[in-house]
Amino acid sequence: MSTMLIAVILLTLLALFFGVLLGFAALKFKVEGNPIVDELEAILPQTQCGQCGYPGCRPYAEAIANGDKVNKCPPGGTATMEKLASLMGVEPEPLNAEAQSQVKKVAYIREDECIGCTKCIQACPVDAIIGAGKLMHTVLTADCTGCDLCVEPCPVDCIDMLPVGQNLKNWNWRLNAIPVTLIQETPHEEKRG
């Protein structure tokens, strides 16, 4: 047999041996994750924005599982907070003061200054920025969560975070908060004829 064939066979056998060894080790030393953390993470919006004070949604889910409050996710809003509270069996609370006091903002790219580097596209966790290399980029404001992660990587500083103004499309009407007075109907007397 040639030395080349022997080397190939030997390396194949070594790769097979170490593959089986790694597979066995992966099964033997598998670390089971906390299933509640996985459920909490599935509820969170996965923007990885850090507005909750944690570096991403997974660390915040782990903190909630360890007893942290469920009202720290501004992009998720009240609906996410209520789902988290029901899963954890705690009373829903209003969003924390920081989340409520923040005016919703969206990214705005000054397109005449954009060099098309795509760094903001790569940084956006929700794919709210569209564009291509060496072409200008723009933000889909309906999809932007205002996480601010696209501002820092921009080399020409052409991204601003602008507050979203109230208009008919995004106004919070609070229809369930309008006071309604129920009037009981009194029975009418039958007409005598």
UniProtKB/Swiss-Prot annotation:
- Residue intervals of the 4Fe-4S domain: 32-90
Where is each 4Fe-4S ferredoxin-type domain found? 105-134, 136-164
One of the entry's Gene Ontology molecular-function terms is:
metal ion binding
Q: Which residues bind [4Fe-4S] cluster 2?
A: C114, C117, C120, C154
Under SUPFAM superfamilies, the record lists: 4Fe-4S ferredoxins
Q: What does this protein do?
A: Part of a membrane-bound complex that couples electron transfer with translocation of ions across the membrane.
Q: What gene is this protein translated from?
A: rnfB
Query: Its GO CC terms?
Result: plasma membrane
What name appears for this protein in its UniProt entry? Answer: Ion-translocating oxidoreductase complex subunit B
Source organism = Shewanella sp. (strain MR-4)
What family does the database annotate?
Belongs to the 4Fe4S bacterial-type ferredoxin family. RnfB subfamily.
- Residues the record lists as binding [4Fe-4S] cluster 1: C49, C52, C57, C73
Q: Keyword set for this entry?
A: 4Fe-4S, Cell inner membrane, Cell membrane, Electron transport, Iron, Iron-sulfur, Membrane, Metal-binding, Repeat, Translocase, Transport
- The answer on whether this UniProt entry bears the keyword Transport reads yes
